[in-house]
Amino acid sequence: KKYQNDANVTRLLHLDSETLLSLCPAEDKLFEVSKSGNVETTFGERPIVEEMNNAYNTFQGNVEYNSGRDLLVYSCMVFPYVAVYKQSGLKDWKLVSELKGAWDYSMSEGKLKFASSSPRGASELALTEDYIVLLQRDDTVEESVPREKAGRDLSTLPKSLFVYDYKLNLKKIINMPFPILRLCGD
């Protein structure tokens, strides 16, 4: 299958052999569903509604789809935010759960800037049959890292797994003795 090179898309999921879901963080609607190359619908409100010219960087994140439950999970990497959407049809997606962390930001010259004390979001996301697993820093047991230093600096990788049910109730925090780069689930 040939993909179009779309610089606005940062994540791409196959919902079935002909249907793609794209995360488009610079757009007003975060998600686009296309079937056989034709856009069928867009959905997903931005968690921060102010107009900004750095939305592409601000709303990048991870998306995973649980086909057994028809649920899409989105987690933002730049700030703590998780959303769960229920699919009832190709064009019918409804926000069913949302988890907003505490974040502090300001606007300057059209750019959204987070305070250095604001926590980052989950760096990875994985789904199991019954749980959402997020890789993120547990500030109660891990050293805090300045926002400027986090990112691709491997010395700042988180060591904690936050396990949620699909209603976004925290079930468990697993603090690992080593840093984690990637997650996968099945």
Where do the language-model regions lie?
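Short coil/turn segments that connect the beta-strands within blades of beta-propeller domains
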Residues: 16-18, 68-70, 123, 129-132
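Beta-propeller blade signature
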Residues: 33, 149-169
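Short, conserved, GDST-rich strand-edge loop motifs in beta-rich repeat architectures
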Residues: 134-156
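Surface-exposed loop and turn segments in beta-propeller and other repeat-based domains
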Residues: 2-4, 40-58, 90-117, 177-179
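Short consensus segments that form the blades of beta-propeller domains
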Residues: 72-75, 113, 148-154
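Repeated scaffold domains used in trafficking and secretory/extracellular systems
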Residues: 5-17, 55-63, 120-124, 178-186
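Conserved beta-strand positions in repeat-built beta-propeller and related beta-rich domains
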Residues: 21-26, 66, 74-77, 134-136
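Short glycine/acidic-enriched loop and turn motifs that connect beta-strands
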Residues: 25-29, 79-81, 139-143
